Amino acid sequence: MRFYSVLLTIVTLIASTYDAKVNASGIQAIAVSSISHDAPAARMLRADHADERGISVPSASKIVEWMLSPKVAKELTFLENRKVQKWVDKQKTQEYVFTKLGLNSGLDKALSNPKLHVYAAYIDRFNVKNPSNKVALLDKFSEKYTDEGVAKMVEMGIRSSNLETENFASRLWRELLNKWMDNAESAEGVFKILKLDEVGGGIFVTPLFNTWYAFIKEGYTRQAEDVVLRVLSDRYGYDGLSRIFFRGQRNFDLVGDLPIKLETRMVNNWLNKDVSPDKVFKLLKLDEGLDKLLTNSNMQVWESYMMKYNLMPDVEPTTMMQTITRFYNFKELSSMLENAKMVPELNKVAERWQHELRVHYLRAPKMKKEG
């Protein structure tokens, strides 16, 4: 009974210090705000401002569940306990224990290694005995497999059906994020560490995007989506970014509705800055050729923007053809639309465009007179 009384006291103290909800992976998309080139100032706000950095801390009931459940932290057997203590007493190095447990045999094998809990226990006990020379669970994994490799392992582990593997991966994930923040890595820097700069338009398809997003969410005082927008638009341009969003919306199970929210924020930024439909047409590079204009996914973004722009107060409403005919002449458009009508998939949209072009052509002289 005394143990439970002490335990309850500990739980109460922890619960009074932190008021948060459990979030195992910490990777969830939320709404966006304005884009900025701000530096990740939150890196300097370590433990004293944990709540501002979005750190998830279990509630009191969850802590009790965690501390009492043998599934959360696998206990050492008698022999494992003796072995760990022997390594610590004899001052065996991380390298020695890492190799001894076979954790240097490849990422896949390391993740499924049944002795992961033994290595974690060794690290914890080593740090207790050497408080001025502490080491991290992450150290040898990063040294052996690189941060990118560890991130891949973490993403696999967090989704594992094995609770021990999931918890070990979560701890590695936390240490990896803290390492980057302690090293003052930028969003661009971690983007390259994870080799996300090599995946092109498939940015929302790779699970490593989640790790990058989680780092930004914890490492920056600004909303994470703002930073994501800035980095991706700087790298891919708005035309490329719009296409990436289109692809990402088909991977809801991996990134949720983040691509939709980012695209919405991008459009709202333009509206807030009163960017004309003509300018957005160019930003999306829709002025660079008629050949694939009808099938260009960026046209959907532009049309949506134009309609929202026309609803704004104190702006002169425009039409789709008013903008398009500033970049392509009537003859070119007519020819393209006639050819498009021959393609079954494009027939309806081509006919709609053709009708709008005729209406615009008939109204153009009147509009010039009024102007």
UniProtKB/Swiss-Prot annotation:
Entry's localization field: Secreted; Host nucleus; Host cytoplasm
Superkingdom of origin: Eukaryota
Motif RxLR-dEER, residue numbers: 43-53
Keywords assigned: Host cytoplasm, Host nucleus, Secreted, Signal, Virulence
Stimuli inducing this protein: Expression is induced during host plant infection.
One of the record's GO cellular component terms: host cell cytoplasm
Residues spanning the signal sequence: 1-24
Chief subcellular location: secreted
Written domain comment of the UniProt record: The RxLR-dEER motif acts to carry the protein into the host cell cytoplasm through binding to cell surface phosphatidylinositol-3-phosphate.
Family: Belongs to the RxLR effector family.
Function: Effector that enhances P.infestans colonization of Nicotiana benthamiana leaves.
Protein name as annotated: RxLR effector protein PITG_12731
UniProt organism field: Phytophthora infestans (strain T30-4)
